[in-house]
């Protein structure tokens, strides 16, 4: 699908650069407030930088993953092509 993640690169801190199958690219920021429940391991800044792509999905070696379609929609709709994952 067009929202499949093709590439992820660690930028710094809690930011990742992502590129999708249709060429859209942007930045994903994972705020500490998001890292609760199953995502609690992402409180570890070092783990954030170990993101990989597996079959079009952004994931981590411990099995955590993020829905690529939601990430794509949020990056596309933001003029800065940035998606900030936060708990409200």
What residue spans do the PLM features occupy?
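Motif-centric detector for short Cys/His coordination patterns
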Residues: 1-88
């Amino acid at each position: 699908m067009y929202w499949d993640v093709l590439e992820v690169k660690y930028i710094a801190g809690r930011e990742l650069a992502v590129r999708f199958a249709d060429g859209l690219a942007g930045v994903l920021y994972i705020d500490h407030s998001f890292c609760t429940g199953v995502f609690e391991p992402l409180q570890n800044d070092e783990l954030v930088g170990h993101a990989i792509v597996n079959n079009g999905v952004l994931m981590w070696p411990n099995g955590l993953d993020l829905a690529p379609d939601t990430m794509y929609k949020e990056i596309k709709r933001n003029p800065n092509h940035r998606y900030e994952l936060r708990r409200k």
